[in-house]
From Swiss-Prot:
Site (Transition state stabilizer): R119
One Gene Ontology term of the molecular function aspect: DNA topoisomerase type II (double strand cut, ATP-hydrolyzing) activity
Residues annotated as domain Topo IIA-type catalytic: 32-496
Subcellular location: Cell membrane
InterPro entries in alphabetical order: GyrA/parC_rep, Gyrase/topoIV_suA_C, Topo_IIA-like_dom_sf, Topo_IIA_A/C_ab, Topo_IIA_A_a_sf, Topo_IIA_dom_A, TopoIV_A_Gneg, Type_II_DNA_Topoisomerases
EC number of the protein: 5.6.2.2
CDD domains per record: TOP4c (cd00187)
Coiled coil: none
Record field: catalytic activity: ATP-dependent breakage, passage and rejoining of double-stranded DNA
Name of the featured protein: DNA topoisomerase 4 subunit A
Gene field: parC
Coarse class of the protein's main subcellular location: membrane
Cellular component aspect of the GO annotation: chromosome; cytoplasm; DNA topoisomerase type II (double strand cut, ATP-hydrolyzing) complex; extrinsic component of plasma membrane
Length: 737
């Protein structure tokens, strides 16, 4: 038995080499498209398998299971689910601007519904798909062995139209990603023709033709032209996109808003669900209802709460809170013709495509020229055979080795003799000299044209230009599939803040929050609290007088702020609803609840003895998850959030030391841990109080208010330890019992 050889290598080097190999495989063979045909390997193999199955646009459909089986069996040794998902996407009219596959059956929907199983669906290629593989049989591209060396597959497709930009691409590799939106083919062809006529054209020239993305789902791009051009100049950027909507007048002066197009890759069902949740949470008070009346076309009906609402303001509030407005990324990271992945700008992508087409036309012309030369050689031999027909037939009949004799006797080449010998005697007898002469003459004319194309770059570029214009004619703006779907509009209302409180009647309310976190609101102020009932084991914790138009700040023990509209708090005399249904407070306690007042200073303090001042406008949260303002270490909590309505602060902790200092010693911050308020050793800060020094320090002791005017003994600098509190101070070391 042969002894095993064990080689010691560095683990780090081995790991890096293998990870690099994996990364390269992911980038080159899976995730990034080729700039020339806009396809990834799985797309290329799928379409080539359909070509081999002769699934032309005018042929019958075949089961998708048959197609997928051929792909994974011959070319792509991966899971059938991944291949079928690819096939489905190439057939979805809402995913691809120019679908490459014509599907029959259930291929999913814009609601996010899955396609039917591959055994039920059928497919064939679309007309534009055939343009990707036109002339592939004419030696226009290289082929390589398949994974098991049993067949050949194309390295690249001839691609007679710029599929990368026309249909876009998405992919996530290792350390890099690509995100290219679809574009209008007519505009791309215009840009390519201009680039052929003006090889030194710049990016700005291209942008005169390419206005921006053109999505299969339509929509409106609301960015300025300068921002769009800047994105294409670098190959990186993003586009803001909005749904298309219109106002429908109804009877009695009412109206409804109808959304007819939604942003690309937004699932309609999830969009409706998103709006419904906002309605339930009372986050969009301008809207009363939404319903889906879509058929083959999208029709989302939004009903305003009041007919006096400006529909533009209603939609602005929805754009701000929902995916009716979304951002589309641009990252043109592709594999170049040199097999190196990099980010290209729009000009470089177009130049790479034209270079590819130049190479395709050159290789096709060379192939056709060689075929013509081969045929001309054969025709010369057939003409000689016609002139010496009887003698040639005699040689064929009588000689055992007629090939050598014919080559020597008539000065024929081996190719010519093979052609004569492979022709039936009956066909030889039917040869007519005029037919041979005519075919020979026609082929010589074609030969001259092809030689001119190969020898004269101008003629070659004329052919490239002619073929691009042919594509433009077939799929241009005047066709159903070619008409631009996405429009452009510079929106000035995007940054407008919609004040939803303007649509709420201002009424006094009293907000009640219990110790167990149940919150409710009662009409009016000065409410009789004795009539309020709580759940068993629960009791009051916060009582706040506010108005329905107020915004309420909720501070959690982890230092996170939440914002609620007072009108959204449960109304009535029941036990209310859990605060956890309104905000994502988790298992944290509520430190305080207070009414938001613009530009008011708030003092935050934690049990570790630190704190800072923060402007109330900085703590406003826009989402249910809140906004982290005070960073609290593990094992500690945010113990206080108080409005600053005095000039001094008093601190007391577990050490039973009282410290008083000027509020001006505390800095104003936007977020963080803050500065040390009181110094402790193995103790925590328990309570703070803000007061005016000249009024004295007061505290509550078993229902009695006590006042200490002489506080000189407790004055100190911020960060000091303090001194024992005055006689009669409550034993719980807090300013309220």
């Amino acid at each position: 038995m042969k002894e095993a050889k064990i080689e010691n290598i560095d683990f780090g080097n081995a790991l890096s080499e293998r990870y690099l190999a994996y990364a390269l495989s992911t980038i080159m063979s899976r995730s990034l498209p080729d700039v020339r045909d806009g396809l990834k390997p799985v797309h290329r193999r799928l379409l080539y398998a359909m070509l081999q199955l002769r699934l032309e646009p005018n042929s019958g459909y075949k089961k998708c299971a048959r197609v997928v089986g051929d792909v994974i069996g011959k070319y792509h040794p991966h899971g059938d689910v991944a291949v079928y998902d690819t096939l489905v996407r190439l057939a979805q009219h809402f995913s691809l601007r120019y679908p490459l596959i014509d599907g029959q059956g259930n291929f999913g929907s814009i609601d996010g519904d899955n396609a039917a199983a591959m055994r039920y669906t059928e497919s064939r290629m679309t007309e534009i798909c055939t343009l990707l593989m036109v002339d592939i049989e004419k030696d226009t591209v290289d082929f390589r062995p398949t994974y098991d060396d049993s067949d050949l597959e194309p390295v690249i497709m001839p691609a007679s139209f710029p599929n990368l930009l026309a249909n876009g691409s998405e992919g996530i590799a290792v350390g890099m990603a690509t995100n290219i939106p679809p574009h209008n083919l007519h505009e791309l062809c215009d840009a390519l023709v201009h680039l052929i006529d003006h090889p030194k054209a710049e990016i700005s020239d291209m942008m005169n033709f390419i206005k921006g993305p053109d999505f299969p789902t339509g929509g409106i791009i609301i960015d300025k032209a300068e921002l769009i051009n800047a994105a294409y100049s670098t190959g990186r950027g993003s586009f803001r996109m909005r749904s298309r909507w219109e106002k429908e007048e109804l009877s009695y002066g009412t109206y409804q808003i109808v959304v007819t197009e939604i942003p690309y890759q937004v699932q309609k069902s999830k969009l409706i669900e998103q709006i419904a949740i906002l309605l339930k949470d009372k986050k969009i008070p301008l809207v009363s209802n939404i319903r889906d009346e879509s058929t083959d076309i999208i029709r989302l009906v939004i009903e305003p709460r009041d007919r006096g609402c400006d529909p533009q303001i209603v939609m602005e509030s929805l754009f701000k809170l929902t995916n009716l407005e979304s951002r589309i990324q641009l990252n043109m990271n592709v594999i170049g013709s040199n097999n190196v992945p990099r980010v290209m700008n729009i000009l470089e992508v177009l130049q790479e495509f034209l270079a590819h087409r130049q190479n395709i036309v050159t290789r096709r012309s060379t192939y056709l020229l060689n075929k013509i030369k081969h045929r001309l050689e054969i025709l010369e031999g057939l003409r000689i055979a016609y002139l010496n027909l009887d003698e040639i037939i005699k040689i064929i009949r009588e000689e055992d080795e007629p090939k050598a004799i014919m080559m020597e006797r008539f000065k024929l080449t081996e190719i010519q003799v093979e052609a004569i010998l492979n022709t039936r005697l009956r066909s030889l007898r039917k040869l007519e000299e005029q037919e041979i002469i005519n075919e020979h003459s026609n082929l010589q004319k074609q030969q001259a044209i092809l030689e001119e194309i190969l020898n004269n770059p101008k003629e070659l570029w004329k052919i490239v230009k002619k073929e691009i214009k042919a594509v433009q004619t077939k799929f241009g703006l005047n066709t159903v599939i070619g008409a631009r779907r996405t429009s452009f509009e510079e929106v000035t209302l995007t940054n407008q803040v919609v004040d939803i409180t303007a649509f709420i009647t201002k009424e006094p309310i009293t907000i009640i929050c219990s110790k167990m976190g149940w919150v409710r609101s009662l009409k009016g102020h000065n409410t009789d609290l004795s009539t309020i009932k709580y759940k068993e084991g629960d009791a009051e914790k916060f009582i706040i007088e506010a108005y329905t138009t107020d915004k309420i700040l909720i501070v959690s023990s982890e230092g996170r702020f939440f914002t609620l509209l007072a009108d959204n708090i449960s109304k009535g005399k029941g036990t209310g609803e859990s605060i956890k249904l309104l905000v994502d407070i988790g298992n944290n306690d509520i430190t305080n609840i207070l009414v938001h007042k613009s530009d008011q200073l708030l003092l935050l303090a934690s049990s570790i003895g630190k704190g800072f001042l923060v402007n109330s406008n900085e703590v406003m949260a826009q989402t249910k998850t809140g906004k982290q303002i005070m960073n609290v270490p593990d094992g500690h909590t945010c113990i206080a959030c108080l409005p600053v309505n005095g000039d001094s602060i008093a601190c007391i902790g577990e050490s039973r030391k009282l410290l008083v200092f000027n509020i001006d010693e505390i800095p104003e911050m936007k977020k963080g841990q803050g500065v040390t308020l009181q110094k402790f050793k193995n103790a925590k800060l328990l309570d703070i109080k803000i007061f005016n020094k000249e009024d004295g320090l007061s505290w509550n002791n078993n229902g009695k208010v006590k006042l200490e005017k002489n506080i000189i003994a407790f004055l100190g600098k911020r960060g000091s330890t303090g001194k024992l509190p005055p006689m009669g101070f409550h034993k719980n070391n807090r300013f309220s019992s």
